[in-house]
């Protein structure tokens, strides 16, 4: 694991990897990748932690589990690999991005440029079987990703937590709101986007807070590839 994570996350999380739940999770993943098609590719599972170091996290956008279609998931919540059509939730995120800050809708769905600026795109479950949403729920991932939220919560430097939908909002109890800033709304899914996601202005609100605390805002615009 030390080779996979950048050093800042390794220092924060190394004790987790020795715990029984993680050993069981690891064995389960070996079996799953051997016997089924599982997303994302093994080298991409920890991309959220690879692209965004512990010290550089400014914003967390919490997702549920990876996209379960071919070629979509690459270890960043809501993001898809270049060349793959953005799924409906991501299309709605782009609509809100345009309405909120006037950014053009990009010709791709990769959010890597956000991750490189300090946006931790974290799913609560990091793997999934092809075509089977939530198939790796309750297997141990939640314990690891809760610990990621916990180490950020303990950090002195404030973090913006963007929580879309009830699943993400269940994590509110882990966040000290006297120290960190929470932006919440319904999920960008087509089933709920019109119930309050559209018009919630998460991108400008996050930047407004970052500027208030003297931090660099995120450039949310996504250049075409």
Curated annotation (Swiss-Prot):
It is found in: Cytoplasm. It catalyses: Hydrolyzes single-stranded DNA or mismatched double-stranded DNA and polynucleotides, releasing free uracil. It comes from the Bacteria. The keyword DNA damage applies. GO terms for molecular function: uracil DNA N-glycosylase activity. Its EC number is 3.2.2.27. It is an enzyme of class 3 (hydrolase). CDD domains: UDG-F1-like. GO terms for cellular component: cytoplasm. PROSITE patterns: U_DNA_GLYCOSYLASE (PS00130). The active site is at residue 65. Its main location: cytoplasm. Keywords: Cytoplasm, DNA damage, DNA repair, Hydrolase. Coiled coil: none annotated. GO terms for biological process: base-excision repair, AP site formation via deaminated base removal. Excises uracil residues from the DNA which can arise as a result of misincorporation of dUMP residues by DNA polymerase or due to deamination of cytosine. Belongs to the uracil-DNA glycosylase (UDG) superfamily. UNG family. PANTHER family: URACIL-DNA GLYCOSYLASE. HAMAP family: UDG. This is Uracil-DNA glycosylase. It comes from Bacillus licheniformis (strain ATCC 14580 / DSM 13 / JCM 2505 / CCUG 7422 / NBRC 12200 / NCIMB 9375 / NCTC 10341 / NRRL NRS-1264 / Gibson 46).
